[in-house]
C-alpha cells in the first residue's frame, strides 16, 4: 500500500481507521473521545480525512491507495506523512512486529542489513495501545521481528497482554530460538503464557558448521537446539522451519534424520522456498534454487519425516513445481499483497489453489512455469497413495 499525506505536519500517530459518509460540508464529522475508546482514530470520508483528537485535516496524495484503507484498519503515520497498515479490519488475524533487530544475520534473510539496523518497531506504550485497539475477536496472532525476544521487557509484556486479552487466539511466535536456551528467560515467559502458543524456529542444518555459516552467528546452532529442547520439555508446541537454498539442499535428508532422532514430538516441519530480497537478493547466485529443484531436494526429507509420523508442509512452492502427490501439503503462505503470478499462470487450472510467487522472485529470477491442466486436478494419483502409505499407517496406530 503506497499511501502518504501531502504537506503533513501532524506528527507521528497510531490510529484506528473509521470510514464514514461525507456530510454536505465535505468534512468528516467530529468523533467524540468516548467513541474512540480512548485511542486516536483516523476518520475517513470520500473526499476528506482528519484525526479525531485534534481534527487535523489531511490530504492524501494517492486517492486510489487511500480507498484501500478499510474500517477497522490500524495504521501508523510517520513524521513525513507515510502511512503503514499494522492490521487489516477485513481480517481476523493480526501481526505484532516488535523489532527489526536480530542477533543473527542469515545469509538468505529477506530483510536487508539496513532494515535490521534501522527498524526498531513501535515504542513500548504504542505497542500496548496497538494490542488494546485490536478487536477482541482476533483468532490468530503472529509475534515477529527481527528477533522479537531482543526487546526482552516489551516481549514479555506483549505475551502476557496477549495471554489475558486474547485467551482463545492461536499465537505463533517467530524466533530463532536462541533466547530460550536461557532457562530464566523461558520461565519468565511461562509465568503467563498464551494458552495456544506455537513457537516457530528455523533449523538450517544437522550440524553446527553449516547452520552457523548460514546464520553467520557462531554458537547459534547450540543455542537454537538448547532452546528447542527447553521449549519441548515444557510442553510448548514447536514448529521447525527449514529455508531451502543451495547452501543446505544436499543435507536435507540428514537434517530429517536429526529431527527424527532429537525432536520426534515436534508439532510440524515446514520447508520454505526463498524470498529473493534483502540478504537473499545480495547473495542470489550462491543461494537460489528454482522451485522444481528445491522440491527435488526436499522430497526425500519430507518422506522420511512422514514415515516417522511427523507432519510436514511446503511454504512458497508453486504447485507446478511439486509432484501431485505432495500438493496436499503445499500452503498458500505468501501474504496477499506480495503474491504475483507469471503470465503463463493464466492458463493453469490450479491457479485458484496455488500460492504463486513472491513479487521479487518473479522479477529477479523469471521462473519457468508449467501450467497444470484441469484433468490433472482430478486424477487418481497412485503415487500419492504410495508416498503417504507409511505415514497414514503410522497415524492410525
Briefly describe each language-model feature range:
Residues 36, 46-95, 113, 325-332:
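N-terminal [4Fe-4S]-dependent radical SAM core
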Residues 110-123, 136-151, 163-182, 193-225, ...:
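Core AdoMet radical
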Residues 160-163, 250-267, 322-339:
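Short, electropositive alpha-helical surface patch
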Residues 153-160, 181-191, 250-258:
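Distinct, well-ordered alpha-helical segments
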Residues 4-12, 323-397:
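Flexible mid-to-C-terminal extensions adjoining Fe-S/redox cofactors in radical SAM and related proteins
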